[in-house]
Every structure is written in structure tokens, then in C-alpha cells.
Amino acid sequence: MNLNELRDNAGSRYRKKRLGRGIGSGKGKTSGKGVKGQKAREGVSLNGFEGGQLPLYRRLPKRGFKNIFRKEYAPVNLGALDKAIADGKIDAGTVVTEDVLRTAGLVGSGKFAGVRLLAKGELARAVTIEVSGASATAVAAVEKAGGSVRTKAARDEAQAPA
């Protein structure tokens, strides 16, 4: 078989039905739209319109609200941090801050209030990490590897005047 002998399977491609081309075509006159009425007209699609019946979105009660003061934290997993150190994107000897994580590409470009360290994956080396927040299991895993974690809450408490 040569490239010039390739053919589509029979029935895999078919022409679309041309509408409004006489009764004999099978799709003539009303072109499959039935008779009269709003749905037979042009440009009918009104999303959520139920013909004067109270629409579903108005029948159901309102729920919840959007908190405009919500703080969103970028998640960074220990496995990703360990891989970045192994790849040479982060120097294990320095303090790993949020800026270091951002330059290494572990934190996205979105507007985040800070970075939260999570415990997914393994950390094989001792690292000092300074982030906005960390899960208890992540802190335990870092300390088990011989490193330490400082969170923003702990820093603020330490700097607060007595």
C-alpha cells in the first residue's frame, strides 16, 4: 500500500444536509424546524428563558457570598521542593524564602497572599524554609530531615512588642 492509495473508511465522511432546497430533499420547506412559533424563528436561543414560566435560576433560593477579603495561598509540596533542589534551581545551603520559590518556578504568577508548605512527597535533605504557612505534617517532615520551618505567624509573634 502506498500513500496515494490511502482512502477514508466508507461512511466516515458525509456531506451535511442542505436545508430548504425543496420538499424532495427531505429537509425542505421548514428545514426541520417544525411550524411557526418562537423556536422556528431566527436568533431564538435565549439562555435560561422558559417561555414565561418562572425560570429555574429564579425559583431556587440565593446561597452563599464571595468574600472579597479572602487570602489565597500558593501551595508548594515537599516533593516539588526536593526536586527543585536536586535539579539545582534552589541552593539547599541558603534560606528558602517565598521569593526563592517564585524564581525557581514553584509558585505560579497569580496574586497570592503567600506560600503554604504542604507535605506531599519526601524531603531528603536539611533545608531552612521561611514561608507564610505550613501544615503540621510538612513541618514534621522537614524537621525529620534535619531542617527547620519558620512561618509568618511565628515571625510576627516573635517581633511583636512585649
UniProtKB/Swiss-Prot annotation:
PROSITE patterns: RIBOSOMAL_L15 (PS00475). HAMAP family: Ribosomal_uL15. Part of the 50S ribosomal subunit. Keywords: Ribonucleoprotein, Ribosomal protein, RNA-binding, rRNA-binding. One of its GO terms (molecular function) is structural constituent of ribosome. Belongs to the universal ribosomal protein uL15 family. Pfam families: Ribosomal_L27A. InterPro entries: Ribosomal_uL15 (IPR030878), Ribosomal_uL15/eL18 (IPR021131), Ribosomal_uL15/eL18_sf (IPR036227), Ribosomal_uL15_bac-type (IPR005749), Ribosomal_uL15_CS (IPR001196). The gene is rplO. GO terms for biological process: translation. This is Large ribosomal subunit protein uL15. It comes from Gluconacetobacter diazotrophicus (strain ATCC 49037 / DSM 5601 / CCUG 37298 / CIP 103539 / LMG 7603 / PAl5). PANTHER family: 50S RIBOSOMAL PROTEIN L15 (PTHR12934), LARGE RIBOSOMAL SUBUNIT PROTEIN UL15M (PTHR12934:SF11). One of its GO terms (cellular component) is cytosolic large ribosomal subunit. It comes from the Bacteria. Residues 1-39 are annotated as: Disordered. Residues 21-35 have a biased composition (Gly residues). Residues 1-10 have a biased composition (Basic and acidic residues). Binds to the 23S rRNA.
